């Protein structure tokens, strides 16, 4: 079973770009380890093609070489936060909410048309950190768009925003999962990986 992880720096997580089987230090590492342990008889191939800094338009541009060409059985997609982040970066790339929806829809339509993969979407999130407070209103507008696309295209959806909100009620330390509100530390990566692995299990066991 071939599983492709696709996304931005949260997925990339320091992986070796010369070796797409390298999971890096992020959630793909944890998800792949959990699945390998849970299904020891399954012949998994895990491929991490996340690229740090990517927006939805950039993911679409590399979708064939970095996703479709692998002929995945399952693909997970975590993308969208950089479309907001880059509105404030030095380059100030102004991607509108409508453009994000158009880009993301194009990604999903192409995956549906050109692969037989089960599609798992993950919601972008912002954790409790002053560094990202200026982005919260924009993420609040983006999340319903992503949920609507998930209803239309995805086989499964991981609501990371809600899952983190609930987890932080039990672990209120803001820096427990991330130092900057976006990029997970080991605790955050394990949290995402565990929830994604549980979602994959639901697909594998069908």
State where each predicted segment sits:
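Serine-esterase "nucleophile elbow" of acetyl-processing enzymes
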Residues: 1-52, 63-71
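Alpha-helical cap/lid subdomain in secreted, periplasmic
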Residues: 30-42, 58-206
């Amino acid at each position: 079973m071939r599983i492709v992880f696709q996304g931005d720096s949260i997925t990339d997580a320091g992986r070796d770009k010369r070796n797409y089987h390298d999971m890096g230090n992020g959630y793909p590492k944890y998800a792949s380890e959990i699945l390998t342990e849970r299904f020891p008889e399954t012949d998994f191939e895990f491929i991490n093609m996340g690229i740090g800094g990517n927006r939805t338009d950039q993911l679409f541009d590399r979708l064939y070489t970095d996703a479709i060409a692998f002929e995945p059985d399952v693909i997970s997609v975590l993308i969208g936060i950089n479309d907001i982040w880059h509105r404030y970066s030095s380059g100030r790339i102004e991607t509108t909410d409508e453009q994000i929806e158009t880009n993301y829809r194009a990604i999903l339509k192409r995956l549906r048309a050109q692969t037989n993969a089960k599609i798992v979407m993950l919601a972008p999130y912002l954790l409790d950190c002053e560094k990202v407070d200026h982005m919260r209103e924009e993420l609040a507008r983006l999340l319903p768009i992503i949920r609507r696309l998930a209803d239309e295209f995805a086989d499964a959806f991981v609501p990371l925003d809600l899952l983190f909100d609930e987890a932080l009620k039990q672990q209120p330390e803001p820096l427990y999962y991330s130092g900057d509100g976006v990029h997970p530390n080991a605790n955050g990566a394990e949290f995402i990986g565990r929830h994604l692995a549980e979602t994959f299990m639901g697909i594998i066991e069908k």
